[in-house]
Structures are given as structure tokens and as C-alpha cells.
Amino acid sequence: MAAKSTDVRPKITLACEQCKHRNYITKKNRRNDPDRLELKKFCPNCGTHRAHRESR
């Protein structure tokens, strides 16, 4: 069985760029997206749509 660190689709958390709150948990494919993932999502803390970036 493969280790979690070498998993092709690991779980990642997305944090708001503005307030740094970790609002979302998702999966990503490391082969297609080797860099940090950045998505525009709604931040309930800020109350607006903001860029959310993968945090470690």
C-alpha cells in the first residue's frame, strides 16, 4: 500500500489569501497540478469571494 505522502490524490486544505482562515478541504491530482492549487471561493469570514490557496 502506498504511503500518504506519495499518494496521487492527497487531501489538501485551502486557506483564504486575505484572512488566512482554512475554509475548505479538497483533493488534487499531483500529476496534473504539481504546484500549489489556487481557486476563487467564498470566504464566510470575509463575506466575499476571495482567492483560496493550498496550505500545508
Curated annotation (Swiss-Prot):
Gene3D superfamilies, sorted: Ribosomal protein L33
Gene Ontology cellular-component annotations: cytoplasm; ribonucleoprotein complex; ribosome
Keyword Ion transport: no
GO molecular function, one term: structural constituent of ribosome
InterPro entries, sorted: Ribosomal_bL33 (IPR001705), Ribosomal_bL33_CS (IPR018264), Ribosomal_bL33_sf (IPR038584), Ribosomal_zn-bd (IPR011332)
One GO-annotated biological process of the protein: translation
SUPFAM superfamilies assigned to the protein according to its UniProt record, in alphabetical order: Zn-binding ribosomal proteins
Keyword list, A-Z: Ribonucleoprotein, Ribosomal protein
Annotated family: Belongs to the bacterial ribosomal protein bL33 family.
UniProt cross-references to PANTHER family, sorted A to Z: 50S RIBOSOMAL PROTEIN L33, CHLOROPLASTIC, LARGE RIBOSOMAL SUBUNIT PROTEIN BL33C
Protein name: Large ribosomal subunit protein bL33B
Gene: rpmG2
